[in-house]
UniProtKB/Swiss-Prot annotation:
InterPro entries: Alpha/beta_knot_MTases, tRNA_m1G_MeTrfase_C_sf, tRNA_m1G_MeTrfase_TrmD, tRNA_m1G_MTases_N, tRNA_MeTrfase_TRMD/TRM10. It comes from the Bacteria. This is tRNA (guanine-N(1)-)-methyltransferase. One of its GO terms (biological process) is tRNA N1-guanine methylation. GO terms for molecular function: tRNA (guanine(37)-N1)-methyltransferase activity. Belongs to the RNA methyltransferase TrmD family. Keywords: Cytoplasm, Methyltransferase, S-adenosyl-L-methionine, Transferase, tRNA processing. It comes from Bifidobacterium adolescentis (strain ATCC 15703 / DSM 20083 / NCTC 11814 / E194a).
């Protein structure tokens, strides 16, 4: 996978040379290049921003600089967008369209990720990604989909963000443009968000993890996603706190059931919206019993609280 990152602080991404992502680069699984957006400026101050049209606080990143950079990295010739090819500049419409498209994609199970990652066809079409706190939330499903791409290009915004016409223009050129939020909060720039998305995406690549099965039971993973059960290691009794006896029983069926029940209970407490999204037809008898004890009705298509 080829990964390009555009930022006014490219040195921020030196951290990507550490840990598993650094090893993945050494093995040739991923090629990461961080570019300085100021390299595409032409003024003495290397300016990348200007005041907002219509007034307001802060500065907005200029489309001229971004377009020269992105045209070069995407191997595109500059052009003028016509009315026929113009896409809406309404951010709500764009977000709704993106969310609808994401919702239409079926979630891939964790087992399929681990077992069939080598057989999933990759796409040669580059994907241009901008972090944006006003965009749809980046999810594990998005990470799974993007892990099948051959080329990802991330643009890191700063100040009040980037000119809204930048993603608009490249969508009109047929580029697959994604805008994602990583949570209901605002950062100083897109670098942190890009690092988060990169780690979520690249760890799903075949050969990235030492044990591919380790991603199977993680939180948010799979078709009927739950939060992961709690994890313990040795010693079994630490400072007076003991691990649950069932985990020491050696009975794998009981251990699996305990962990499943704990995942259901934890998800019920912290993320009941994930319980509501479960497919009741894929719950076994023990799942149903646990959910009913937690106050859920499981006779319909999806659980609902009593």
């Amino acid at each position: 996978m080829k990964i390009d990152i555009v930022s006014v602080f490219p040195e921020y991404f030196e951290v990507l040379n550490l840990s598993l992502l650094g090893k993945a680069q050494e093995k040739g699984l991923v090629e990461v290049t961080a570019h300085n957006l100021r390299d595409w400026t032409h003024d003495v101050h290397h300016s990348v921003d200007d005041t907002p049209v219509g007034g307001g606080a802060g500065m907005v990143m200029k489309p001229e600089v971004w377009s020269e950079c992105l045209d070069e990295l995407l191997h595109l010739e500059p052009t003028t967008v016509t009315c026929d090819s113009m896409v809406t500049c309404d951010s709500t419409a764009d977000a709704d369209d993106t969310a609808s498209a994401d919702a239409a994609e079926p979630a891939e199970s964790a087992t399929e990720i681990a077992a069939n990652a080598d057989t999933v066809p990759a796409t040669d079409r580059p994907v241009l990604i901008f972090p944006n706190p006003s965009a749809p939330l980046f999810t594990q499903q998005d990470a799974t989909e993007l892990s099948h791409a051959n080329h990802l290009l991330f643009g890191c915004g700063r100040y009040e963000g980037y000119d809204a016409r930048i993603p608009q223009y490249y969508r009109a050129q047929g580029v697959d443009v994604r805008e994602y939020s990583i949570g209901d909060y605002v950062l100083n720039g897109g670098e942190v968000a890009v690092s988060v998305m990169l780690e979520a995406i690249t760890r799903l690549l075949p050969g990235f993890m030492g044990n591919a099965a380790s991603i199977v039971e993680e939180s948010y993973t799979g078709e009927n996603a739950l939060l992961e059960h709690r994890q313990y290691t040795k010693p079994a009794d630490w400072r007076g706190i003991k691990v649950p006896d069932v985990l020491l029983s050696g009975d794998h069926a009981k251990v699996d059931r305990f962990r499943r029940d704990e995942a259901l209970a934890k998800t019920n407490e912290l993320r009941p919206d994930l319980i509501e999204a479960l497919d009741c037809s894929k719950l076994d008898k023990a799942d149903r019993k646990t959910l009913m004890a937690l106050g859920w009705e499981v006779s319909g298509a999806h659980p609902r609280q009593r």
